[in-house]
From Swiss-Prot:
GO MF annotations, alphabetized: cysteine-type deubiquitinase activity; K63-linked polyubiquitin modification-dependent protein binding; zinc ion binding
A Pfam family that the UniProt record links to this protein: OTU
Biological processes annotated in GO: brain development; cell migration; central nervous system morphogenesis; cytoskeleton organization; positive regulation of Wnt signaling pathway; protein deubiquitination involved in ubiquitin-dependent protein catabolic process; protein K29-linked deubiquitination; protein K33-linked deubiquitination
Species whose genome carries this gene: Danio rerio (Zebrafish)
Bias (Polar residues) ranges: 118-136, 183-203
Protein name: Ubiquitin thioesterase zranb1-B
Positions bound to Zn(2+) 2: 88, 91, 102, 105
Source superkingdom: Eukaryota
Length: 716
């Protein structure tokens, strides 16, 4: 048996691979365990052994010819009976009469398949128009060789992915590229040259005669080729090993390149956005993740083996990984928070800023006009107007079902549940929530990196930072007052690290590098912001900001990943106290997302005294914001200097200096947030009224229909 017989043919691309290969060298397909007879029968006395009908793996071949179908003993003066064979209409392969499918391409046998006419003993198998050729050692081998050469010669290569397609294919079966208009059907000379240098014909010791190497068409198919002289078995093995070593690596690289090109050609825009998002998680590019989310991409999508191959970074990407897995693996807490933020899609959100676009644009212009830069050594931006947003008290006059619909469309139910039920962070005091009417509601906003800026404007003006006016002021203030904020930030970070037992010192270059990163976040629309930016926003608002947030980052499995460090009080410490307002705003923080916490208007104070003399009129709404957590521990004051840090009593004294504080009858230290509808901005009041009119109309419809029914009953 020759070395050629050891090769196995790929069932996908018909490439003949070396026996040691477990995958196809061309298309990387797995080796099939139940091979179809694709090689010509070999001239050997062992062919009479019936055991050859079974492969080494024990699987039975599809066709096992015996002595009754075709005599396996070759007689010099006797030719096989080929008249009973039928030719496949797809690949022209000559199959045995008992086969119901083609051995090569598995095509169904047609009724009345064309059979070859019997040959006279003096004729040799050849087509018309070709000169006679010497009789081969085995006529069946001759026909099988011709069929393979015909099949290869008639294929046309795809100009996009180089895959060789069948001649009847009008488009490439791999990349769907159209067939070139001038594709040659039978490249005669190429097939002859390829057959002469084909690696599948290495050393044929048993073929001593000259045989035909023609293609599938007529013409000059009778060109002769003389085989190389026979060599010993050891030399043949050495030659095969050298060929597989030298050519195999090049073939594998070429096959990998072709496979990669095929995968790229099949990919769509959504696939590229997903791969960019995966790379963005690894490299820390949040914009790529946001681009994938905004396009409607599935966050739970998993990487496939082909996509991992395109990314070409096995140390970072594995098949089956999602964006959440990558964010956990590379500790991207900000991205993890964005990815895990679940926004309910069951109800369409309907907030005042979306219902009244004309009024909203006017309010945005008012916001831009209210921002000014102070002259002097500290050129920070600041607001000239004190505006506080509250939900109207008329909501309580609506029917319960309309109220439920309103809250579903204006509140973030997931944030409200996490801050109230999963962790007692807000509304934990029955005294504040019920008797003092200081229940806080989490407004819904965008889930992108602008959620901090959106929540600040929602808590004051009731709108989004759509035009990035507040972000621009934040960026300019950070750069213009960089020295002031940098000193506070550096001193605070050093103290905070030491408070957790982390005694280390950084070089000034490292501090500057971290500070440059904080500055860059402020200038990038959509980038998530940090504690320093909340501190700067307190100066722009000229009022304190109280953040009620979760204490720990948690994975989607509920595992604690680290401290959030956002909860606490942010005071405008770099301004003079006389230049600032004492009425704070409240924000909620959950898993990398900020939400505005607002109260509902109340009808005056009545007997709601909280241990303080409230000499105000009935039009003013006072919301009592707790300055302690549910465990009655004082909230931290962020970015204090070394001189300002002291005991808890000293920090409480500082809170009383910057805010109007009092202690309730239950002993809770609270800060008073004051707002007045009469003193509020008229555009904000008009926007809220127009938004509320839509729910009033919903409440009026059932009443109207009930009244009509009553009138009809009276008429009867």
């Amino acid at each position: 048996m020759t070395d050629l017989g050891l090769k196995w043919s790929c069932e996908y691309c018909t490439y003949e691979n070396w026996p040691s290969a477990i995958k196809c060298t061309m298309c990387r397909a797995q080796r099939h365990n139940a091979p179809i007879i694709t090689e010509e029968p070999f001239k050997s006395s062992s062919s009479l052994d019936p055991s050859l009908c079974t492969t080494q793996g024990g699987s039975t071949l599809l066709i096992c010819p015996d002595s009754s179908a075709r005599p396996r003993v070759r007689i010099a003066d006797e030719l096989p009976e080929t008249s009973s064979k039928w030719s496949c209409h797809m690949c022209t392969y000559l199959n045995w009469p008992r086969a119901i499918r083609c051995t090569q391409c598995l095509s169904q046998r047609q009724q009345g398949s064309q059979q070859h006419s019997p040959l006279s003993p003096s004729e040799t198998p050849q087509t018309s128009g070709s000169r006679p050729s010497p009789v081969t050692s085995d006529p069946c081998e001759e026909y099988n060789d011709r069929n393979r050469l015909n099949m290869h010669a008639q294929r046309w290569p795809c100009s996009a992915c180089t895959y060789e397609n069948w001649p009847k294919s009008l488009r490439c079966v791999v990349c769907d590229h159209p067939k070139p208009s001038g594709s040659p059907e039978t490249p005669q000379q190429d097939s002859e040259a390829e057959s002469a240098t084909s690696p599948s014909i290495v050393n044929e010791q048993e073929r001593e005669n000259v045989r035909t190497a023609g293609g599938g068409g007529g013409g000059s198919r009778g060109r002769l080729r003389k085989l190389s002289p026979p060599m010993c078995k050891g030399q043949a093995e050495v030659k095969i090993e050298l060929a597989s070593g030298a050519v195999g690596s090049d073939n594998e690289q070429e096959a990998d390149f072709k496979k990669l090109k095929q995968i790229r050609n099949r990919m769509r825009r959504s696939d590229w956005l997903f791969l960019n998002a995966c790379a963005g998680v690894v490299e820390g590019d949040l914009a790529a993740v946001e681009a994938y989310k905004s396009s409607g991409g599935d966050i739970a999508r998993q990487l496939t083996a082909d996509e991992v191959r395109i990314l070409n970074r096995p140390s970072a990407f594995d098949a089956g990984f999602t964006l959440v897995h990558l964010a956990i693996r590379f500790q991207r807490q900000d991205m993890l928070a964005v990815l895990l933020t679940e926004v309910s899609q069951q109800t369409a959100k309907c907030i005042p800023a979306l219902v009244c676009p004309e009024l909203t644009e006017q309010i945005r212009r008012e916001v831009a006009a209210a921002l000014h830069r102070r002259k002097g050594e500290f050129p920070c931006y600041f607001f000239t107007d004190l505006v506080t947003f509250t939900l109207p008290a008329d909501i309580e006059d609506l029917p319960p079902n309309v109220q439920e619909k309103l809250f579903d469309e204006v509140l973030d139910r997931d944030v409200q549940k996490e801050l109230e039920e999963e962790s007692p962070i807000i509304n934990w005091s029955l005294e504040l929530g019920t008797r003092l009417d200081s229940r806080l509601y989490a407004l819904w906003n965008r889930t992108a990196g602008d959620c901090l800026l959106d929540s600040v404007l929602q808590a004051t003006w009731g709108i989004y930072d759509k035009d990035s006016v507040l972000r621009k002021s934040l960026n300019d203030s950070l750069h213009d007052c960089s020295h002031w904020f940098y000193t506070r930030w550096k001193e605070w970070e050093s103290w905070y690290s030491q408070s957790f037992g982390l005694h280390f010192s950084l070089r000034e270059e490292q501090w500057q590098e971290d500070w440059a990163f904080i500055l860059s976040l402020a200038s990038q629309p959509g980038a998530s912001l940090e504690q320093t930016h909340v501190f700067v926003l307190a100066h722009i608002l000229r009022r304190p900001i109280i953040v009620y947030g979760v204490k720990y980052y948690k994975s989607f499995r509920g595992e604690t990943l680290g401290y959030t460090r956002f909860q606490g009080v942010y005071l405008p410490l770099l301004w003079e106290q006389s230049f600032c307002w004492k009425s704070p705003i409240a924000l909620g923080y959950t898993r990398g997302h900020f939400s505005a916490l607002v109260a509902m208007e109340n009808d005056g104070y009545d007997n709601r005294g909280a241990g303080a003399n409230l000499n105000t009129d009935d039009d003013v709404t006072v919301t009592f914001l707790p300055l302690v957590d549910s465990e009655r521990k004082l909230l931290h004051i962020h970015f204090l200097s070394a001189q300002e840090m002291g005991t808890e009593e000293q920090q409480e004294r500082m809170l009383r200096q910057w805010m109007d504080c009092c202690v309730t009858e239950g002993g809770v230290l609270v800060a008073m947030q004051k707002s007045s509808r009469r003193r509020n901005h008229p555009l904000v009041t008009q926007m809220v009224e127009k938004w509320l009119d839509g729910y009033r109309q919903l409440a009026a419809c059932p009443t109207l229909s009930d009244g009509e029914e009553e009138e009809e009953d009276e008429d009867e």
